[in-house]
UniProtKB/Swiss-Prot annotation:
InterPro entries: Ribosomal_uL14, Ribosomal_uL14_bac-type, Ribosomal_uL14_CS, Ribosomal_uL14_sf. This is Large ribosomal subunit protein uL14. Part of the 50S ribosomal subunit. Forms a cluster with proteins L3 and L19. In the 70S ribosome, L14 and L19 interact and together make contacts with the 16S rRNA in bridges B5 and B8. The keyword Ribonucleoprotein applies. Belongs to the universal ribosomal protein uL14 family. Coiled coil: none annotated. Keywords: Ribonucleoprotein, Ribosomal protein, RNA-binding, rRNA-binding. PROSITE patterns: RIBOSOMAL_L14. PANTHER family: 50S/60S RIBOSOMAL PROTEIN L14/L23, LARGE RIBOSOMAL SUBUNIT PROTEIN UL14M. One of its GO terms (molecular function) is large ribosomal subunit rRNA binding. One of its GO terms (cellular component) is cytosolic large ribosomal subunit. CDD domains: Ribosomal_uL14. One of its GO terms (biological process) is translation.
Amino acid sequence: MVSFMTRLNVADNTGAKQVGIIKVLGSTRKRYAFLGDVVVVSVKDAIPSGMVKKGQVLRAVIVRTKKGQQRKDGTHLKFDDNACVLIKEDKSPRGTRIFGPVARELRERGYNKILSLAVEVV
């Protein structure tokens, strides 16, 4: 569960290291983003030779959260950090590699390309 101005680690190779959430997309009253939600982010920290630059405004999908999430089978899912993957308008990832584990809930939201690039799906 992440909200406005939360800092997220970036789990891909676009060159961004950290981003800050500007807006949680969805309904007008949506305050928090969970696994698989799309958010509008601003790049806060990036490497100089990367695809994206500091200050750029992009879309991202949440792939890991510290706040635990209950699954329908009763298991509880919790990660060590809050992380996202930068995406294009057509839901495809901007980078070519995904670092770290990602949640299986992304499959239900239609992010199969992110799951195929991920090292580990939990």
